[in-house]
Amino acid sequence: MLKIVLIVVVVVLVIFLVPRLFSGSRAVPAPDSPAPDFSLPSQEGTSVNLKDYRGKWVVLYFYPKDQTPGCTREAHNFQIDQAKYNERQAVVLGVSVDSVTSHKKFCAKEGLNFKLLADQDGRVSAAYGSLTNLGVAKFAARHTFIIDPSGKVAKTYTSVDPGGHSEDVLAALDHLQKR
């Protein structure tokens, strides 16, 4: 019985602690702090710079992998709600460590018309505290940041349900824009 308990403890430690040891991420930017600036290629191959969106609200969402069930559901919901984001003067930008080619295929297959950004080296994901690096594999954690028109982080989400997340973000935008 003691052997089983010891094995369970070791497995739990490996599952929860090892990814943190290899994370490579910094802390998640706090609300009211400047959003880390970046320049990343989109699925179209053009550079997207955060500073170019000053004056608009930005929904910057990080996700693990193109064409996986949760990430596809989350992207679909952001796509369905694009008109609502436009009404709020907000732009949606998705970020993962996938390649430009992977993003291009994902957008074509799923009918996505907002920008997906390729953070292949993981630097931007790390700057936002959203990189998990396991050594042989790395991926972005499912985090979202609402960035206000002045370039400051207005709200962070570090626990995201891909199914209803877009609705939550829209409600938060409504609240934030009333302040």
Q: Where are the language model's segments positioned?
A:
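Short active-site neighborhood of thiol/selenol oxidoreductases, capturing the structured segment around
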Residues: 50-73, 78
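A short beta-strand-turn-helix
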Residues: 29, 38-58
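Structural microenvironment flanking redox-active thiols in thiol-disulfide oxidoreductases
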Residues: 72-112, 120-126
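Short loop/turn microsegments at loop-to-beta-strand junctions
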Residues: 35-36, 57, 141-143
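Thiol-/selenol-based redox modules, centered on thioredoxin-like
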Residues: 139-179
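N-terminal targeting signals for export/organelle localization
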Residues: 1-41, 179
